């Protein structure tokens, strides 16, 4: 009999077994508890006898004979003591002949519930191990992709602008780049078209065809958005949403600056990717970013006492350039001329009704002298149409010249002062030359004789002279105004520029073209020989006669 350790029990429990083979062969057993005093005494007596013989010393004791049942990994139940002292060195010895020592007689039967629980635990362990391995693989994939993402350059083919803006922001957050145009620098092409269908053939100049020829990665937008970016951004979103202790950590701030760029707002801090304008500037660039900026200029801030050097809109007169400042003298002159013209227009409008009333009164006061002869200077002088009494002299020529003016309508005489004055002069001349003689008219028929008093003619002459003097006064004032305006010295602003003929800059255009150097070049015909030859080539030929 050997005193050893039970192979199915804990290492610290020392149990006496009759034979080890009996443990594996028994199928059923009963746990018998001996709690009477006789059995206790027998155990104590056996212990004393063994100590007296000096064969073995053991600390094994049964305390109140209380045992517990423990489950081993192989689902076997054994009896172990509840409490024990420190283990001692195990020595092989023969088992005592007393068969009353408590021994383990068999294995406990396996319960169905215990077996199902054990199976579920085993399955859970297998699934847990699989999940842990998948998580480890996923973390490794994310680590590798995040490391390589700054070297990726994407080109989005046929993507919606709103979606493209969101995807571009996420790619830049991970350190990648989005190319505006397709080129050889692109590493990945993301498209909304079906790329799995091999039967579909695209044109030679198509982006998909070019990408396949250059061995680029071709991804669908679904893969890029829902699988790659979503997986890589999960931890980033969690860390940004949750409060972290690394908010002020230097390594974290350096990482954010590397991915998103610097957040510095101070204009005095230099940056590698931006140049800040410090003053007024003019910047004309291509909105599609195809060409470089067309025009770029920056002006320095002027001193308080000087004008601004950059172009600004100014209040100028009509026809003047709004960017060229106009002198105060020109502005005051233009304003005064406008005010004077407005005043004259108002005066003309106010004088028009009075002139109309005066003309109507003159028409009403004059008698109707149409188609009649007019008497001479004397009141009793008459124009007779008797052919026999009229001599054949040079008076007939005068009569022919004066008869049309005599027969004009009196209304026309009132409208035009010159015509009216001509009528009066011709009447007076004809009356003086006739010397109370009869003047023959153009027709042989009798014409009625009309007698006009000298008082009416004098009044008509007086009114015509007054009207003529008024018109002359107005003409004189208008001509005087024009003469004063022409004599007034007009101030011309200096026009600076560059003369390509003289190859020099000038401050005043008028003074430069009158300079000796410019005139010497302009008067030399050899300088314009090439230009004359060009004009001769493009000249239109004359039509042959």
From Swiss-Prot:
GO function terms (MF aspect): nucleic acid binding; protein kinase activator activity; protein serine/threonine kinase activator activity; zinc ion binding
Record text on subunit structure and interactions: Associates with hsk1. Interacts with mcm10.
Gene transcribed to yield this protein: him1
Post-translational modification: Hyperphosphorylated at the G1/S and S-phases of the cell cycle.
Function text: Activates hsk1 kinase and is essential for G1/S transition. Has a role in S-phase checkpoint control induced by replication fork blocks after nucleotide deprivation and DNA damage.
The species this protein was found in: Schizosaccharomyces pombe (strain 972 / ATCC 24843)
Main location: nucleus
Single biological process term from Gene Ontology: mitotic DNA replication checkpoint signaling
Keyword Cell cycle: yes
Coiled coil: none
Keyword Zinc-finger: yes
The protein's name: Hsk1-interacting molecule 1
Subcellular location per the Swiss-Prot or TrEMBL entry: Nucleus
Keyword tags: Cell cycle, DNA damage, Metal-binding, Nucleus, Phosphoprotein, Zinc, Zinc-finger
Database matches in Pfam families: DBF4_BRCT, Dfp1_Him1_M, zf-DBF
Zinc finger annotations (DBF4-type) as residue ranges: 492-541
Binding site for Zn(2+): 499, 502, 512, 518
UniProt GO cellular component terms: Dbf4-dependent protein kinase complex; mitotic spindle pole body; nucleus
InterPro entries, per database record: BRCT_dom, BRCT_dom_sf, DBF4_BRCT, Regulatory_Dfp1/Him1, Replication_Regulatory_Kinase, Znf_DBF, Znf_DBF_sf
């Amino acid at each position: 009999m050997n005193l050893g350790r039970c192979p199915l029990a804990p290492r610290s429990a020392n149990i006496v077994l009759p034979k080890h083979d009996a443990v594996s062969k028994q199928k059923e057993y009963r746990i018998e508890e001996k709690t009477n005093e006789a059995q206790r005494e027998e155990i104590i007596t056996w212990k004393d006898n063994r100590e007296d013989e000096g064969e073995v010393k053991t600390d094994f004791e049964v305390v109140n004979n209380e045992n517990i049942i423990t489950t081993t990994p192989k689902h076997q139940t054994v009896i172990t003591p509840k409490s024990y002292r420190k283990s001692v060195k195990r020595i092989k010895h023969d088992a005592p002949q007393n068969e009353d020592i408590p021994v383990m007689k068999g294995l406990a039967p396996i319960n169905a519930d215990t077996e199902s629980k054990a199976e579920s635990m085993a399955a859970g362990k297998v699934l847990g191990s699989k999940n842990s391995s998948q998580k480890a693989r996923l973390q490794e994939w994310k680590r590798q992709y995040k490391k390589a993402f700054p070297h990726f350059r994407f080109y989005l083919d046929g993507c919606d602008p709103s979606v493209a803006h969101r995807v571009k922001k996420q790619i830049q957050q991970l350190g990648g780049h989005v190319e505006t145009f397709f080129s050889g620098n692109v590493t990945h092409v993301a498209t909304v078209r079906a790329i799995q269908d091999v039967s579909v053939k695209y044109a030679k100049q198509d982006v998909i065809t070019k990408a396949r020829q250059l061995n680029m990665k071709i991804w669908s937008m679904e893969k890029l958005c829902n699988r790659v970016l979503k997986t890589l951004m999960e931890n980033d979103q969690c860390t940004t949403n949750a409060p972290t202790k690394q908010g002020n950590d230097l390594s974290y701030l350096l990482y954010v600056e590397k991915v998103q760029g610097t957040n510095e707002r101070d204009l005095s801090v230099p940056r590698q990717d931006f140049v800040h304008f410090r003053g007024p500037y003019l910047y004309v660039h291509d909105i599609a970013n195809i060409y470089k900026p067309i025009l770029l200029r920056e002006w320095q801030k002027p001193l308080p006492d000087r004008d601004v050097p950059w172009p600004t809109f100014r209040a100028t007169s009509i026809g003047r350039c709004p960017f060229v400042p106009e002198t105060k003298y020109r502005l005051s002159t233009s304003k005064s001329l406008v005010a004077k013209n407005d005043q004259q227009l108002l005066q003309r409008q106010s004088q028009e009704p009075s002139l109309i009333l005066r003309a109507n009164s003159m028409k009403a006061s004059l008698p109707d002298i149409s188609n009649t002869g007019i008497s001479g200077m004397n009141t009793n002088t008459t124009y007779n149409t008797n052919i026999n009494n009229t001599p054949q002299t040079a008076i007939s020529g005068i009569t022919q010249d004066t008869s049309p003016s005599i027969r004009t309508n009196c209304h026309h005489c009132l409208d035009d002062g010159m015509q009216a004055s001509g009528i009066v002069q011709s009447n007076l001349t004809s009356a003086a030359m006739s010397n109370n003689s009869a003047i023959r008219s153009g027709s042989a028929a009798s014409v009625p004789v009309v007698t006009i008093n000298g008082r009416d003619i004098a009044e008509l002459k007086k009114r015509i002279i007054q009207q003529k003097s008024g018109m002359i006064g107005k003409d004189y004032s208008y001509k005087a105004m024009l003469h004063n305006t022409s004599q007034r010295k007009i101030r011309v602003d200096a026009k600076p520029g560059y003369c390509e003929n003289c190859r020099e800059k000038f401050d005043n255009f008028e003074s430069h073209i009158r300079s000796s150097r410019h005139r010497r070049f302009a008067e030399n015909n050899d300088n314009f020989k090439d230009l004359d030859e060009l004009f001769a080539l493009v000249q239109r030929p004359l039509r042959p006669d």
